[in-house]
Amino acid sequence: MISIQGKGVSSGVGVGPLYFYHRTKTEIPRYTVTDPDAEWHRFKGAQTAAIEQLGELAEKARAEAGDEAAMLFETHQMMAEDLDYEEAISDHINNEKMNAEAAISDTAVQFAAMFESMDDSYMQARAADVRDVSDRILGILSGAVQGGIASDVPVLLAADDLAPSETGQLDKSTLLGFITAGGSGSSHKAIRARTMGIPAIVGVGDALKPEYEGRPCIIDGATGNVVIDPDDMTRDYLLKKREEQLRLQRLLETLKGQPNVTKDGKSIRIYCNIGSPDDVHAVQVNDGGGIGLFRSEFLYLNSPDYPTEDQQFEAYKKVLADMNGKEVIIRTLDIGADKQIGYFNLPKEDNPAMGMRALRICLTRPEIFKTQLRALYRASAFGKLGIMFPMVTSVWEVREAKKYCEEVKRDLKAEGIPFAEDVQVGIMIETPAAAIMSDRLAKEVDFFSCGTNDLTQYTLACDRQNNDLGRFYDPHNPAVLRLLKMVTENAHKNGIWVGICGELGADLTLTETFLAIGVDELSVSPRAVLPLRNAVRMTDTRESAPRLLAAIDAEFPETL
């Protein structure tokens, strides 16, 4: 029996033979060209063919699995014709006289490195997208045939890595789960596995040997454990665990439509975090009570230029209308120097996490901010909208932002354009400054939403993307929990509500703590709604609150 440890990114137990993904590798020729125009036309021809392929794949994915599955290929279409991407390839061909293949390859390396250097895990995962798009164009230039799964029976798939489009084309009927050498929980393969409801493990490194192919294997997506040639005891244990997981999933399905109320009658709202209008379907399927965080950056990241007011309005309107009266809280632009978008022309900064980003950009470039606010207020006529400002550190920033809101509303009224008068305005609490000033900030807004990812990072002075700091980056640290408790108390003293929209909101080991603190809303990924509802309904705060509130004041996080 061989046991390998990785990182589980999609829960479940998979049992079957191990199969290695066979990918056709394309050698990249490099030579100096004498006719750059001809080389550019070679690239453009392959680019056009790639865009057509991606369109066909998007339609196939939509027919088989809905809009959410199709979105990956549509995003790749936009990336393939991105002006910055094209310009970089053009520079290599025209200025350095590179052949098309070398120009595409070097551009992919350059863009992937840029994404990987960013602080945001979502943006880091985009490195795989640009590699994938480039590989598709290179494959067309070389005439290479894409690899795939050639097995006739369901298998556990093993690979060094899976490109986003490869993940998107996986057929659930032949896939029991997959294991990759690299990857993260925010990668496309992890998201796709969770969408398909199959177990997945990433980060096993070079532990999977070619000689393991075809041998019996069991994977546990919850623990990240891979067992090859399992003995009877291990096999029986994991099979029983799979049955228990299936039983729990059936139980969770019965919770749809049930209230989020503890045994002693304390209620809490459970909302969802989304990144595009296509995610609304997942919110509805998983019975989310609303949307607590709609990241509006997708409009800017997927556009070759600043999105217009009408483009933004249509996107916001669609989400509000689709949510059918349920609350939708949209976060204003959270672009920063660590999320470079070419047309923003942001300067390179040594410390982008503390540089020009989010609300700071909006307040220094009011034309961008006002365009977004106009689109938001126009969309408010079609549903229950809340507007949320990110990365706040002071009262004056909030007052300045609110001035622009009032200015936009006056303009819309003068133009006879309808909008809702009762739009709530809130802020994200994700800096220690905002937490410390929460008693004053609470007088300025209608709600707080705590972004625990950045709040933990800034409070502990610890880069959450640095794996070497894993033991020091602890969201359970009493310093973080005390700040959340203080923010909640200050919010309630001033008659406003408070929520949590970071990853910590879905941490079931802290659900009782958040209920004890008095948090009013938890906003999580759609798939986390029902497990969180179950945890809430199993809690009795009369018993747990005194113990947990005392633990927050403890010296060591282990007491929690």
Feature annotation, model-predicted:
Residues 1-322, 328-335, 365, 372-373, ...:
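Non-catalytic, soluble scaffold/interaction modules
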Residues 249-560:
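Conserved alpha/beta-domain cores
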